[in-house]
């Protein structure tokens, strides 16, 4: 049923042209956020000018004394907080150990994109210390982030259609992703929007595999089903290269393995069961590879002297293995998070951080509530409650994703810098569907949550552009 403020004609237009609706809503939201960024410059300089100095570069000399255009100002304001690390890594790879806390995915994509543009002669190769090169990387990072955000909304819309077969719910969920409380983090050179795109795409392929498994259509063969599953694992693995919490996307694979184990125990030689378990194993391994790959690269660089990158022959033997190299499961990511960023179980539970917990509480509650409701089968669209074999597999996918979402909230509250939950939650579809379901049903709580999302993203945008917390 259309909301009361919409005319039937407007409601029909939205449903007839869902992609146009998403595109126009996306453009309007981005213009709103960018206006906030530019408006923040009227208040004064950013609290920390690292982003602006990074983009100027030492080669520009008196660049700080020259007035910057709106475009340059926008780029500089968006290159704040962790974006500085991503842009720097895109320019010259990881140099300092603590930079390994930031996923290699975005720097790799930006670097590859710029190298491609250099190869075809669209842009010049960067100088040794050229400030313009860093502007190029920052701009490329912004373009990648915004493009990924748009595509992730479109993919989430398609995913909702495959899972729920409900256009209204799917469209509302995608629109909620557009106005995510992650706000400018999905517009700046950060990894969240790319993570969401890869995660939603992986879930879409996994859902298509669930549909193929239960279909009598000759085009939906077991081979096609298994290819969907493996491809989903590859995309989840790529998402993990962008953000380490992508490992939680392995939950559907684990649940599917458990679902097929009884059949394997009864008939260990059944070809279809063996093939299905093999596909799930390959897909799950691909998810894990997204985390293990960067860890292995770091181990070769820091723990094996002959492989140390960036050291000359005379310096190579002076490099001593780092403390984390001696661990039972050596992980540079775990070490730098603890050593440099003070990430660990209950380490963030201090009185000065209480305001950050209060800011994160609404999103934590939404994640836990929506996850628990989905695990219990509550607040699902009406059509989803008539479960056949195919829908049962999809509901298993939803519940495994909901469990991963709840685990993410628990980890954020106990181990992470809790305030990041508002942005990293953008890559999880269940809470979008849960909130969309409430809105479609006319639930006033859903409307209040949307109001919170818009207000939070607006205020956070002004603070981010001024290099002020929370980040």
From Swiss-Prot:
Q: Which Pfam families match?
A: Mannosyl_trans2
E.C. numbers: 2.4.1.-
Superkingdom as given in the UniProt entry:
Eukaryota
UniProt entry tagged with the keyword Membrane? yes
User: Topology with regard to the membrane?
Assistant: Multi-pass membrane protein
Q: Which residues cross the membrane?
A: 23-43, 135-155, 169-189, 190-210, 227-247, 277-297, 348-368, 449-469
Q: Which GO terms describe its molecular function?
A: alpha-1,6-mannosyltransferase activity; glycolipid mannosyltransferase activity
Q: Name the source organism.
A: Chaetomium globosum (strain ATCC 6205 / CBS 148.51 / DSM 1962 / NBRC 6347 / NRRL 1970) (Soil fungus)
Q: What class of enzyme is it?
A: transferase
Q: Supply the InterPro entries for this chain.
A: PIG-V/Gpi18 (IPR007315)
Q: According to its UniProt record, where is this protein mainly located?
A: endoplasmic reticulum
The identity of this protein, by name, is GPI mannosyltransferase 2
User: Can you say where in the cell this protein is located?
Assistant: Endoplasmic reticulum membrane
Q: Which family does it belong to?
A: Belongs to the PIGV family.
Q: Outline what the protein does.
A: Mannosyltransferase involved in glycosylphosphatidylinositol-anchor biosynthesis. Transfers the second mannose to the glycosylphosphatidylinositol during GPI precursor assembly.
- Where does this protein act, in terms of pathway? Glycolipid biosynthesis; glycosylphosphatidylinositol-anchor biosynthesis
List keywords of the entry alphabetically: Endoplasmic reticulum, Glycosyltransferase, GPI-anchor biosynthesis, Membrane, Transferase, Transmembrane, Transmembrane helix
Entry annotated with the keyword Isomerase? no
Q: Which GO terms describe its cellular component?
A: endoplasmic reticulum membrane; mannosyltransferase complex
- A Gene Ontology biological process term: GPI anchor biosynthetic process
């Amino acid at each position: 049923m259309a909301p009361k403020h919409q005319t039937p004609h407007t409601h029909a237009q939205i449903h007839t042209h869902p992609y146009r609706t998403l595109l126009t809503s996306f453009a309007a939201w981005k213009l709103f956020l960018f206006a906030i960024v530019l408006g923040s410059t009227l208040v004064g300089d950013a609290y920390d000018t690292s982003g602006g100095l990074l983009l100027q570069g030492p080669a520009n000399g008196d660049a700080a004394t020259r007035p910057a255009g709106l475009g340059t100002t926008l780029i500089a304001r968006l290159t704040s907080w962790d974006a500085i690390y991503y842009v720097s890594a895109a320019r010259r790879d990881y140099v300092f150990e603590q930079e390994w806390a930031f996923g290699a995915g975005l720097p790799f994509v930006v670097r590859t994109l710029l190298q491609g543009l250099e190869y075809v002669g669209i842009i010049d190769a960067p100088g040794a210390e050229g400030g313009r090169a860093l502007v190029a990387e920052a701009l490329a990072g912004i373009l990648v982030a915004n493009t990924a955000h748009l595509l992730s909304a479109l993919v989430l819309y398609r995913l909702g259609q495959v899972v729920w077969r409900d256009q209204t719910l799917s469209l509302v969920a995608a629109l909620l992703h557009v106005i995510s409380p992650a706000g400018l983090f999905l517009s700046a050179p950060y990894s969240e929007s790319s993570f969401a795109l890869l995660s939603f795409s992986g879930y879409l392929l996994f859902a298509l595999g669930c549909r193929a498994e239960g279909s009598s259509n000759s085009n939906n063969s077991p081979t096609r089903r298994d290819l969907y599953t493996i491809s989903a694992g590859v995309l989840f693995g790529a998402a993990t290269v962008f953000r380490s919490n992508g490992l939680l996307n392995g939950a559907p694979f684990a649940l599917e393995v458990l679902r097929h184990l009884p059949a394997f125990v009864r008939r260990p030689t059944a070809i279809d069961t063996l093939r299905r378990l093999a596909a799930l194993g390959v897909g799950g391994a691909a998810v894990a590879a997204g985390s293990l790959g960067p860890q292995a690269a770091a181990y070769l660089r820091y723990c094996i002297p002959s492989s140390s990158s960036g050291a000359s022959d005379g310096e190579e033997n002076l490099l001593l293995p780092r403390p984390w190299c001696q661990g039972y499961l050596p992980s540079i990511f775990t070490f730098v998070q603890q050593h440099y960023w003070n990430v660990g179980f209950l380490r963030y539970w201090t009185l000065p951080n209480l305001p950050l917990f209060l800011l994160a509480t609404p999103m934590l509650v939404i994640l836990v509530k929506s996850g628990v409701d989905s695990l219990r089968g509550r607040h699902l669209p009406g059509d989803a409650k008539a479960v056949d074999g195919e829908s049962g597999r999809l509901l298993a996918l939803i519940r495994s994703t909901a469990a991963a979402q709840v685990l993410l909230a628990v980890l954020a509250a106990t181990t992470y810098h809790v305030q990041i939950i508002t942005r990293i939650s953008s890559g999880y579809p269940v809470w979008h569907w849960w909130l969309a379901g409430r809105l479609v049903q006319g639930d006033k709580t859903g409307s209040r949550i949307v109001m919170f999302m818009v207000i939070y993203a607006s205020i956070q945008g002004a603070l981010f552009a001024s290099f002020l917390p929370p980040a």
